[in-house]
């Protein structure tokens, strides 16, 4: 859901997956998705919302999408209805409302999330995994909010530093700290 430019799909695509449906509302992204995956016969691209799609799925992914949807609970209820029995719902969202700031507003986030939101009985789905990711990102995002309060988008230099230096460090720190804090929350559910 919310495939964006398709980078996740491109990086993790496997031809043995029989049916992949990418949904995207942004018309430019939709056009780019059609161009990028036109040779992949097992990928369907749609501008429909999850409740309008006829298929049922083994897995539904919301990777940095739910925070852009005003009625997030309703969206998840619709997704649950589209899951096959024993299907998985995977959600990745920005964590910690206390660090919500100008960057969040600028990119259309309605909110950031707390772990409590992803309680075990969310929509009567079984919680399989719940953890934070990107520990260094949390620290840097928090510092950025304090020292660059009015900044809406990070500079190219900050993005470079993040991608090349802090992301690899964050991966190690996440593991060492057993995913106890971070800039993002990942929740994995199974339909009972």
Model-inferred region functions:
Residues 102-117, 132-133:
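Acceptor-substrate binding/catalytic loop of class I
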Residues 38-41, 107-110, 145-149:
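Short, hinge-like loop/turn segments at secondary-structure boundaries
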Residues 69, 112, 179-180:
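Short, solvent-exposed loop/helix junctions and linker helices
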Residues 94, 111, 129:
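Localized chelating/binding microdomains
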Residues 1-101, 119, 187-190:
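Conserved SAM-binding loop
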């Amino acid at each position: 859901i919310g495939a964006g430019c398709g980078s996740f799909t491109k990086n993790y695509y496997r031809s043995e997956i029989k049916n992949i449906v990418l949904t995207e509302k942004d018309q430019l992204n939709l056009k780019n998705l059609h161009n990028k995956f036109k040779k992949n016969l097992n990928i369907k691209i749609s501008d429909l919302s999850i409740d309008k799609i006829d298929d049922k799925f083994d897995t539904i992914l919301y990777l940095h999408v739910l925070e852009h949807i005003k009625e997030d609970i309703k969206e998840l209820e619709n997704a649950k209805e589209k899951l096959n029995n024993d299907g998985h719902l995977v959600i990745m969202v920005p964590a910690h409302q206390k660090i919500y700031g100008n960057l969040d507003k600028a990119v259309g986030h309605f909110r950031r999330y707390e772990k409590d939101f992803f309680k075990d009985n969310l929509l009567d789905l079984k919680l399989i995994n719940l953890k934070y990711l990107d520990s260094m990102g949390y620290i840097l995002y928090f510092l950025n909010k304090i020292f660059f309060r009015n900044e809406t988008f990070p500079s190219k230099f900050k993005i470079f530093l993040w991608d090349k230096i802090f992301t690899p460090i964050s991966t190690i720190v996440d593991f060492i700290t057993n995913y106890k804090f971070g800039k993002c929350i990942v929740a994995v559910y199974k339909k009972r």
